């Protein structure tokens, strides 16, 4: 998985910041063991923080999540159906978002028509722990994963808060 930039609140911090996030999987293994945050805001510019997941906790890695998406009967059937209709299914970049002592994975699916039109967002896939969902919007996909009711329209969105312990090095 390639590193990517995001805005999030790091564990122990009071405000969000712009970071470069890199998830880590062990050599020849597929599970996730840690993630690294490279801070980009002052006064912490250039500082690196490594967050290890607890040793006894299994956190799925990107390859495991991709395999689970491919093996999901409903998702696989939909992708096959869209591909046969003369369109191309484009899988967007898989994002790993730290939440508590685990990861939320988010991957958009785009559909590009044969006639060269710009791809349109068709579905959003989310995965957390053993749960996986594919819905028309991110909000609906998150509701499938976490349950609950939709947020009120006037409610301001709240960023995810990562919770993990920095590694002692």
Regions found by a protein language model. Name each.
Residues 1-169:
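Accessory, solvent-exposed terminal regions and/or long lumenal/extracellular loops of proteins
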């Amino acid at each position: 998985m390639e590193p990517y930039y995001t805005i999030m609140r790091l564990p122990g911090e009071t405000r969000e910041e712009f970071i470069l996030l890199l998830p880590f999987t062990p050599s020849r293994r597929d599970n996730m063991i840690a993630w690294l945050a490279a801070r980009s805001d002052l006064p912490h510019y250039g500082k690196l923080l490594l967050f290890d997941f607890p040793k006894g906790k299994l956190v799925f890695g990107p390859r495991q999540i991709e395999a689970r998406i491919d093996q999901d009967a409903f998702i696989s059937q939909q992708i096959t159906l869209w591909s046969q209709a003369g369109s191309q299914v484009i899988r967007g970049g898989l994002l790993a978002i730290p939440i508590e002592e685990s990861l939320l994975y988010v991957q958009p699916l785009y559909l590009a028509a044969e006639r060269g039109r710009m791809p349109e967002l068709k579905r959003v896939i989310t995965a957390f722990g053993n749960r996986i969902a594919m819905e028309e919007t991110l909000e609906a996909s998150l509701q499938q994963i976490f349950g609950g009711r939709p947020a009120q329209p006037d409610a301001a969105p709240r960023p995810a808060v990562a919770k993990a312990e920095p590694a002692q090095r």
